[in-house]
């Protein structure tokens, strides 16, 4: 089930009955300062699902107010999830924190990505102010197998450094 501001669109099976494709729609159109959004995704034994979004997620500039999105994914034994949302666009002056935790049981498989675009580059906007913080944790049977923390401040030298983004506005 889903609760506002999220809505699941009708599931479909373009690959046949073996894997269900689901699209999560964020009906508000974007995430603003002081928003706190939570997603809890639970796949039962032997489930096979691909989850995506219909469009990029927009993180609006917030005058310092923090927006938070928390995604918790639990996959039971032999479950399979492809978590492939469209990109996240972090507008200039946004203050955004995302936490994702994936819990895997025996033989469960998760494939996922997060593609982040800093600033609305099609408009020439750069991410010169604000903060972006991302936590990703993947656990199998209560043991960590991957823990990653990423943090970018607006106008950070890492946006331009060769050991950073090298002047490119996208990471993923």
Regions found by a protein language model. Name each.
Residues 116, 120-172:
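A structural signal for small-residue-enriched, beta-sheet-centric alpha/beta enzyme cores
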Residues 54-55, 71-73, 81-84, 104-105, ...:
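Short C-terminal domain-edge/linker segments immediately following a structured domain
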Residues 42-44, 76, 103-105, 139-141, ...:
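Solvent-exposed residues in well-ordered beta-strands and their adjoining turns
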Residues 68-70, 97-99, 107, 133-135, ...:
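Extracellular structured ligand-interaction cores
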Residues 1-87, 92, 99:
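N-terminal, charged/glycine-rich beta-strand/loop interface patches
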Residues 91-99, 104-129:
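Acidic (Asp/Glu-rich), glycine- and aromatic
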């Amino acid at each position: 089930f889903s609760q506002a501001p999220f809505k699941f669109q009708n599931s479909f099976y373009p690959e046949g009955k073996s894997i269900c494709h689901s699209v999560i729609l964020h009906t508000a159109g974007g995430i603003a300062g002081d928003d706190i959004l939570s997603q809890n995704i639970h796949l039962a034994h032997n489930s096979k699902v691909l989850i995506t979004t219909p469009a990029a997620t927009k993180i609006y500039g917030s005058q310092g107010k923090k927006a938070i999105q928390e995604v918790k994914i639990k996959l039971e034994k032999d479950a399979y999830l492809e978590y492939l949302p469209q990109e996240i666009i972090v507008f200039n002056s946004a203050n955004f924190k995302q936490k994702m935790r994936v819990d895997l049981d025996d033989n469960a498989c998760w494939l996922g990505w997060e593609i982040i675009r800093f600033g609305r580059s099609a408009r020439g906007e750069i991410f010169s102010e604000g903060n972006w913080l991302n936590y990703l944790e993947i656990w199998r049977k209560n043991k960590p197998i991957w823990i990653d923390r990423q943090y970018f401040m607006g106008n950070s030298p890492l946006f331009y450094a060769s050991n950073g983004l090298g002047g490119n506005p996208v990471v993923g």
